Design a protein with these regions (language model features):
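A short acidic, often aromatic-flanked loop/helix-cap motif at beta-alpha or helix-coil junctions
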Residues: 16-17, 46-50, 106-107
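A short secondary-structure junction motif
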Residues: 13-31, 52-60
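PIN/NYN-family metal-dependent endoribonuclease catalytic core
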Residues: 1-24, 41-43
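A generic structural signal for alpha->beta connector loops
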Residues: 5-7, 37, 80, 98
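Acidic, PIN/NYN-like endoribonuclease modules and their adjacent C-terminal/linker elements
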Residues: 78-107
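A generic structural signal for well-ordered alpha-helical segments
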Residues: 1-2, 33-34, 58, 76, ...
Length: 107
């Protein structure tokens, strides 16, 4: 991604989820220092509408999706971006909407 000069953006909800899992003040500050170098993007009205559509489409197909995953997917779609993730739930979500995933290069 960096090699291809793609902008890196972190959704605000991902920043929150990441820092919520930190157990010490020192680790929290260290994580915040690392993440502060990235642009943080916040969901807007259109992102929330798209997330609702994604959840609805998932549920119609019998797929369980969290609201947080749906908002992350929606923000990525609305930015015409690619999502870098190791969470398999997004692979499932990408099959029912226009979510593009970043493909890791094989070694």
């Amino acid at each position: 991604m960096i090699k291809d000069d793609w902008p890196l953006v972190i959704p605000g909800i991902v920043l929150q989820e990441f820092l919520t899992g930190v157990t010490s003040d020192k680790s929290f500050q260290k994580g915040l220092d690392v993440l502060s170098g990235f642009n943080v993007n916040y969901a807007d009205y259109e992102d929330h509408l798209m997330a609702a559509r994604i959840c609805s489409q998932c549920h119609k197909k019998g797929i369980q999706s969290s609201s947080i995953d749906a908002i992350i997917a929606a923000m990525t779609i609305n930015l015409n971006g690619r999502l870098l993730t190791v969470d398999n739930d997004f692979k499932t979500i990408s099959k029912i909407c226009h979510l593009k995933l970043f493909q890791f290069a094989s070694r």
